[in-house]
From Swiss-Prot:
The APC/C is composed of at least 13 subunits: apc1, apc2, nuc2, apc4, apc5, cut9, apc8, apc10, apc11, hcn1, apc13, apc14 and apc15. InterPro entries: APC_su15/mnd2. GO terms for biological process: anaphase-promoting complex-dependent catabolic process; cell division. The gene is apc15. This is Anaphase-promoting complex subunit 15. Residues 57-119 are annotated as: Disordered.
Length: 136
């Protein structure tokens, strides 16, 4: 038997098997492939860091969950404050507003931000505007 005939015979057996797998074997192979695919997806989800992000997708989800829990704790604290009646009365709120209006900062010196820009109204361009027939 020559090498070419052996290769042809082997290829034929690979592509056209004499016995076909049973349904159980096919289902078992399908489950194996699905678990392998899931493992690959989860591996990437836990370890690969996308470009521009400093954490993996799993780390990002964990961080978002932690932030949600902190926000829930903050809302629980706010609800406790509502129940305790620690907020000021209406008259007290008016007093607080009056205090804010009286505050003035005299220590802050105003800075002209466009001091180095020439004023267009004072430039030489507009001095001889009557030459061009424009009226003010």
């Amino acid at each position: 038997m020559s090498f070419m005939s052996l290769m042809a015979n082997t290829a034929h057996q690979l592509w056209y098997p004499t016995s076909f797998p049973s349904m159980k074997e096919l289902e078992k192979e399908e489950v194996r492939l699905e678990t392998q695919e899931l493992a690959i997806k989860q591996f990437g989800f836990r370890t690969i860091r996308p470009i521009g992000l400093n954490r993996s997708m799993q780390e990002q989800l964990d961080l978002e969950e932690q932030e949600r829990e902190e926000a829930n704790q903050d809302t629980e604290l706010d609800e406790e404050e509502l129940g305790s009646g620690s907020f000021p009365e209406e008259g007290e709120m008016d007093d607080m507003d009056g205090d804010n209006e009286e505050v003035e900062d005299h220590d802050i010196e105003e800075v002209d931000l466009d001091a180095d820009i020439t004023n267009a109204d004072a430039s030489e361009f507009y001095e001889d505007i009557s030459e061009y027939g424009f009226q003010n």
